[in-house]
Regions:
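Alpha-helical bundle segments that constitute or directly flank the non-heme di-iron/ferroxidase center
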Residues: 12-17, 32-61, 81, 130-140, ...
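Hydrophobic alpha-helical segments
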Residues: 1-3, 115-117, 164, 210, ...
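Long amphipathic all-alpha helical oligomerization modules
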Residues: 168-199
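Acidic, carboxylate-rich catalytic segments that either coordinate divalent cations
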Residues: 194-224
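Active-site-proximal alpha-helical scaffolds that flank and shape metal-associated catalytic sites
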Residues: 66-170, 199
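Short alpha-helical hairpin
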Residues: 8-33, 51, 174-185
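A non-catalytic, amphipathic alpha-helix used as a structural packing/dimerization or gating element
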Residues: 39, 43-50, 73, 77, ...
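Amphipathic, well-ordered alpha-helical segments in soluble domains
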Residues: 19-20, 47-54, 81-85, 108-112, ...
Length: 224
C-alpha cells in the first residue's frame, strides 16, 4: 500500500467529518449565508499567505531540483490565489480592502498557520510535506463532492470551480506522488512523524471550516 493510501485510510474519519460540516453541505446547496462565506474568504486570504510561505520553505528543503520547482511554483500560486480573492470574492461580497486588513486572524486560522510555519521551519522535508498535504488533498476531495451535489446557478460556483477544476487536481496528484516518493526513502520513525503531521493538518482543516460557519473569532473571547 502506498504511503498516501495509508494516510487517507488512517484519517478517513476526519475527512468524513469535514465533508459533513454544515459549511460544505450548505455551500453545495447554495444556502450558505453570505456572512459565513465572507468570514471564510477573509480568513482564507490570511491563511494562503502563510501557506505560501510554508511552501517556499518546503521548496528550500526539497531533496531534488524538480521538487524545488514544484513547491516554489505552488508557493507562487498560493499568493496569486490570495490576491485573486481580493479581486473576485471580496468584491462580490462587499468586503473592502480596509475591512480585510483590519480583520485579525481567528483562533482557528492562527492555530493552523502557526502549525504550518513552525513545522516548515523546524521539521525535516518529509514531515513538512505531510503537514502541507491536507490542504491540497482535502480541498480537492471536498471540491469533487460539492460538484457532485451542487445546485444549478450556485452563488458560490466560482469557488467551486477553483477547487474542483482539473488544473488543481493535477497539482494535487503531483504533490501526492512526491509525498510517496519521499516517504519511500524514510525510516519508520520519520513515517510516524509524517502520519502525526498529516493528522494534525487534517484536524485543522476541519477546525478552519467549522470556525468559518460559526463565524467564530476567539472561542470564549468573542464578546470580551
Amino acid at each position: 500500500m502506498l504511503f498516501s493510501e495509508q494516510l487517507w485510510q488512517r484519517n478517513l474519519d476526519l475527512y468524513q467529518k469535514t465533508l459533513a460540516l454544515p459549511f460544505n453541505q450548505e455551500l453545495a446547496q447554495g444556502t450558505l449565508s453570505p456572512e459565513a462565506f465572507g468570514h471564510y474568504v477573509i480568513q482564507d486570504a490570511h491563511y494562503l499567505l502563510a501557506y505560501g510561505r510554508a511552501l517556499a520553505v518546503c521548496a528550500a528543503k526539497a531533496y531534488e531540483a524538480d521538487d524545488v520547482m514544484q513547491f516554489s511554483e505552488a508557493a507562487k500560486i498560493a499568493i496569486v490565489v490570495e490576491r485573486s480573492l481580493h479581486d473576485s470574492f471580496m468584491q462580490q461580497f462587499d468586503i473592502s480592502k480596509q475591512e480585510f486588513e483590519s480583520t485579525p486572524l481567528t483562533l482557528a486560522c492562527h492555530h493552523y498557520t502557526s502549525f504550518l510555519t513552525a513545522t516548515a521551519w523546524s521539521e525535516s522535508y518529509p514531515v513538512v510535506l505531510a503537514a502541507l498535504l491536507p490542504c491540497f488533498w482535502i480541498y480537492a476531495e471536498v471540491g469533487k463532492d460539492i460538484v457532485d451535489n451542487s445546485i444549478a446557478n450556485n452563488p458560490y460556483q466560482a469557488w467551486i470551480d477553483t477547487y474542483s477544476g482539473e488544473e488543481f487536481h493535477t497539482a494535487v496528484r503531483n504533490v501526492i506522488a512526491t509525498v510517496n516518493k519521499v516517504a519511500a526513502r524514510c525510516d519508520a520513525d520519520t513515517l510516524e512523524k509524517m502520519h502525526a503531521a498529516y493528522r494534525m493538518g487534517a484536524k485543522l482543516e476541519w477546525l478552519f471550516w467549522d470556525s468559518a460557519y460559526q463565524q467564530r473569532q476567539w472561542h470564549g473571547l468573542d464578546h470580551a
